[in-house]
């Protein structure tokens, strides 16, 4: 079993304590065993749909889907893939908002297992620590690579950054298109969903909140 980083352990514990962890049931399967089991189930699903798995276009599809689930789009279920995080002392004494806008994210709706496609915007006010900017993107992408609901995803990113930075002063906003709305059901191709999660002064100070929300425009 791969040992988890201290950062991964801290973030997971914080999410569990706040009831924000993705619903999970522990099992003893390793990655290869998961892929083999998923491949078998996917083969059965495709056969049930009447698809001919002897056709060269379909023959490898169960294997491809299993590999994609475990190694890619659901890799965020495995904390051994939690990004290596660089947090450094705030020697420059930065005390103004740092904002990273338009972080691309692709997730999967946990209700229908279809795509959520959107952008995340992250801001924080440094206290004792600052984080490498690319690490913010990687943390967003880690939590997106799970079956998700957008509300939980937003809060998970917030709490992870609060935990790693040692400050409540973090704000997250996500704007996303849900293909469970766009490609099925109501078939609405133009609507999107916005969720926001605010901590610390972003929640308690109207001017700081307005600065963050204003930074989302344009």
From Swiss-Prot:
GO terms for molecular function: GTP binding; GTP cyclohydrolase I activity; zinc ion binding. One of its GO terms (cellular component) is cytoplasm. Keywords: GTP-binding, Hydrolase, Metal-binding, Nucleotide-binding, One-carbon metabolism, Zinc. Pathway: Cofactor biosynthesis; 7,8-dihydroneopterin triphosphate biosynthesis; 7,8-dihydroneopterin triphosphate from GTP: step 1/1. It comes from the Bacteria. SUPFAM superfamilies: Tetrahydrobiopterin biosynthesis enzymes-like. It is an enzyme of class 3 (hydrolase). It holds the Pfam family GTP_cyclohydroI. Its EC number is 3.5.4.16. It catalyses: GTP + H2O = 7,8-dihydroneopterin 3'-triphosphate + formate + H(+). GO terms for biological process: one-carbon metabolic process; tetrahydrobiopterin biosynthetic process; tetrahydrofolate biosynthetic process. Zn(2+) binds at residues 109, 112, 180. Toroid-shaped homodecamer, composed of two pentamers of five dimers. NCBIfam families: folE, PRK09347.1-1, PRK09347.1-2, PRK09347.1-3. Belongs to the GTP cyclohydrolase I family. This is GTP cyclohydrolase 1. The gene is folE.
């Amino acid at each position: 079993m791969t040992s988890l980083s201290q950062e991964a352990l801290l973030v997971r514990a914080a999410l569990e304590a706040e009831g924000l962890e993705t619903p999970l049931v522990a099992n003893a399967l390793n990655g290869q065993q998961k892929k083999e089991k998923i491949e078998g189930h996917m083969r059965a699903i495709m056969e049930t749909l009447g698809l001919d798995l002897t056709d060269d276009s379909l023959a490898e599809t169960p294997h491809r889907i299993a590999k994609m689930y475990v190694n890619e789009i659901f890799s965020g279920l495995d904390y051994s893939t939690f990004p290596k995080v660089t947090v450094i002392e705030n020697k420059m004494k930065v005390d103004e908002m740092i904002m990273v806008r338009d972080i691309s994210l692709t997730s999967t709706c946990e209700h229908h297992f279809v795509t959520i496609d959107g952008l995340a915007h992250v801001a924080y006010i440094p206290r004792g620590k600052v984080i490498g900017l690319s690490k913010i993107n990687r943390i967003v992408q880690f939590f997106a690579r799970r079956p998700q609901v957008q509300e939980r995803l937003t809060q998970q990113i917030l709490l992870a950054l609060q935990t790693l930075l040692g400050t409540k002063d973090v704000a997250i906003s996500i704007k996303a298109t849900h293909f469970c709305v766009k490609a099925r059901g109501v078939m609405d191709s133009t609507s999107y969903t916005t969720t926001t999660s605010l901590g610390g002064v972003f929640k308690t100070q109207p001017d700081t909140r307005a600065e963050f929300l204003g930074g989302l425009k344009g």
